[in-house]
Amino acid sequence: MGSESNQQTIDDKFNRVDIKARNSKDEIIIVEIQNTRELYYLERILYGVAKAITEHISLSECYYEVKKIYSISILYFDIGKGDDYLYHGQNNFTGVHTGDRLEITTKEKDALVRKLPAEVFPEYFLIRVNEFNKVAVTPLEEWIEYLKTGCIRHDTTAPGLGEARKKLIYYNMSPEERHAYDEHLSAIM
């Protein structure tokens, strides 16, 4: 999927993301790397999610076709106070007077709701890279360690990091070395 400008009209805002992909459930994943503090950052990621939702449903489609969106923000600045490096946000419906959480029913015969809120509403992940200060054990932690340090461990088991290491080695070669490497690969294939 594209990841740059998706401006529909001249007066429309565009939504620049670093990676936009679909998973095996046809849900949309938006990944954005943010190096510097930005005014109205939360509003911008909300706009990006709304834009992605509307881009992936046409006028003739039923609202049931609305795609689930995951917004992942990799932050290299301090967005606020908190002890964790990974935060998750999702819509919940809470009683104003009672404080109880509304349990949506989808099983009844004439239910007006076919999906649970967790299956419909966007989810937001804020990864505060600079707050990661532990030994990476899980694949996610290995990725965050790489994002913080720029180094990939030789014993990594995280999906994609081994491939990323190979790409980094390739792109760190001089143009002459890359050409020789490409010629070598062509010769043996």
Q: Where in the sequence are the language-model features?
A:
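Elongated, amphipathic alpha-helical interaction scaffolds
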Residues: 1-189
